[in-house]
Every structure is written in C-alpha cells, then in structure tokens.
Amino acid sequence: KLDKYDEYAYSQSKDVITSLELERIMNAAGPTKGHLERLSDGKAPKEMVFIQCVGSRCADDRGKSYCSKICCMYTAKHAMLIRDKYPDVNVTVFYIDVRTPGKNFDEFYRRAVEQYGVR
C-alpha cells in the first residue's frame, strides 16, 4: 500500500521507514539489537524526520478521510526515546495538525517539544 505515497521515497531509499519498522529497529531483539542506525550504511543518523498524516485525512482516494488518532502519540514516544538515547540526533515532525485525544496526551506531546527539543 505504501506505493500509493511514493512521493516520500519509501521504495527508493532504505532510510525511509515506517513507524512499525522504526519500532522493530529500536527493539533490543530487533535486527540492529536496539541501536539506531541507517539501513543504507549502518551509520548513526544525524537527523530523523517523521511525516505525519500520510494516508489520513486525504481528499483523494489514496487514503482515509479521517484521522487515525494514534500517530501523534506514538511519534512523540519515538521522538522522546530517540532524543533520550541519542541526544545529538535532531528530530523534526511534519504534520497537518497535532491531535492528542486522551487525558494528559497534550502534556505528553508538549513534553516532547519542550523537554526533548523535538521540532
């Protein structure tokens, strides 16, 4: 299904990964034993970019017209884990808008920005 969104270069670069693939990489039982590294060359990244809302809130037939309501929170979690373990890695998040629909979720997301320096 990701071929619908090839403008993000998922099929063209080993370093463009999904959130599920990142979860696997960050896992101690994963292919890199929990070490964050680029799949293309095994080196540590200097920058990580998360692109939100891909396939959600689409005006065309490639995706869904609604928000999944989970992406903002697990991106905040991933961003904080990366910044905590790798403080020299710059983390940037691109999004339509931030949606934090649960109790204290907005504080959690704000902490990623204010305490962890996620942009």
Question: Would you name each region that the model predicts?
Answer:
Residues 2-102:
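Rossmann-like dinucleotide/flavin-binding elements
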Residues 90-93, 113-119:
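A conserved beta-strand/loop element that lines the FAD pocket in flavoprotein oxidoreductases
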Residues 6, 104-116:
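Short, aromatic/basic amphipathic alpha-helical patches
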